[in-house]
Amino acid sequence: MKLLFDNLPASLAPQRETLARCFEAMNRMMPLRAVYLFGSHARGDARPDSDVDLCIVADGAARQLEAAQSFRRGMRPIPAKPAFTLVPITPDRLGEKRTAGDHFFRTVLKEGVLLVTQD
């Protein structure tokens, strides 16, 4: 797992260590292919109470709800602030969504900030 924190928006700079711990915990649960930051932090219009929206691309994310719960269990020891919204998806499913022109995932890929890649 490679962290790309040079891409981290200024609004999340104080959370750099927390994010690194979160990504490491997630990677232990299920090896990460990529993590995209999307939403207000990626757009640059986050408020102090904004959550951190993450699209998590992982091979084991076939069952989205179970994957999100698994990632949350891995993150339990990490402080609850900021709040996270997790959208797990497999690489194959993400490719299908992209090909189908899915608006949500097209926006994540176009406007999102890549924070994690495979080594």
Where are these regions (language model features)?
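Catalytic core of pol beta-like nucleotidyltransferases
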Residues: M1-A34, R43-P48, A58-D119
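Glycine-rich beta-strand-to-loop/alpha-helix junction loops that act as flexible
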Residues: F38-S40
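Short beta-strand->loop micro-motif that forms the acidic, two-metal-ion catalytic signature
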Residues: D53-V57
